[in-house]
Amino acid sequence: TERNAPPFGAGLGLKPWGVDPELQWAGARAHNRWIAEFCHEAPLRRIGLAIVPMLYDVEQAVREVEWAHDNGLQGILIPALMGDYDAYNHPKYYPVWRACEERGMVVHNHSGPAPDYDFKLPGAMGIFLVEFAWWTARPMWHLIFGGVFEEFPRLKYCLTEVSEFWVPSMLEMMDVRASVKHTSGKLGDFRSNLSMKPSEYFDRNCWLSASALFDEGSTTVRHDIGMQNIMWGTDFPHPEGSWPRTREKMLQYMKGIPEGELEQLLASNAVTCYGLDEAALRELAGQIGPEKSLFEANPS
């Protein structure tokens, strides 16, 4: 589905095996130079992410975060799959999280990564569709239970293109697992590094970018997730996204949603997440954005 007009897809940020780290870093830097130039052409409308294969070399990763910020990019994409490398709850990665927190660089994982499948086998695609969101989101609970958001309370993390209907049950499961029970003593201390519930770290530090897979399931659970944590996108120009029928998709899944919630989904949550220029974007939205009447349940 990589029908991108740009010359790069998301593949550089997915798997840390079967590749030469040096070549992956070279490809990532080529992408990052290009995306910085691309966003510079329309800095108000384009939010660029640097690909940072941080598993291989923490010092290199910090330098790339610094370069990306200095060149106008607003976040990084890291591998969702960690393979045999140290997982993201390892303190060795603290310099990367610190560099991102200090610069307001949002850390991202993008859908797609999963263990290698033999798609010639029966049901392989169905298995992938069930599992891909779990693999993509796996770094999130490493960051939560690993105390990364405790150590770096202003660090921002975003999951993109993973659907949202499954998130409330995952938040509930993390809270249950983190709760103190008389039966959990044998498991050792895995909570003293946390001052809040896992769901509270999610509420404060995490966002969901609902590009491509925003559907009725995601719409109905929006309050269970937290209205301030969800952003909507078109996934342009991929065929699984809303384009070229974005207006119709908006009508299908958003009609009747209260105006304040729509503003969060379509605008203010992204402004908060990425630290955008709200006044300038409101002026631009007045020129090219959808009319409010489009979403009214019973327009006059």
Regions inferred by a protein language model and the residue ranges of each:
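Mid-to-C-terminal alpha-helical segments outside catalytic/metal-binding sites
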Residues: 26, 33-41, 63-66, 146-147, ...
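Glycine-enriched alpha-helix->loop->beta-strand junction motifs that scaffold or abut catalytic
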Residues: 71-75, 101-106, 124-128, 152-155, ...
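Short secondary-structure boundary/capping segments
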Residues: 123, 173-176, 246-249
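Active-site gating/metal-coordination segments in enzymes
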Residues: 1-146
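Aromatic-lined glycan-binding groove of carbohydrate-active enzymes
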Residues: 107, 111-115, 145-203
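Mobile, glycine- and charge-enriched loop segments
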Residues: 36-39, 43-50, 193-205, 287
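Hydrophobic faces of well-ordered beta-strands that scaffold small-molecule active sites
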Residues: 47-50, 76-78, 107-109, 157-159, ...
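A general structural motif
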Residues: 136-141, 186-191, 210-214
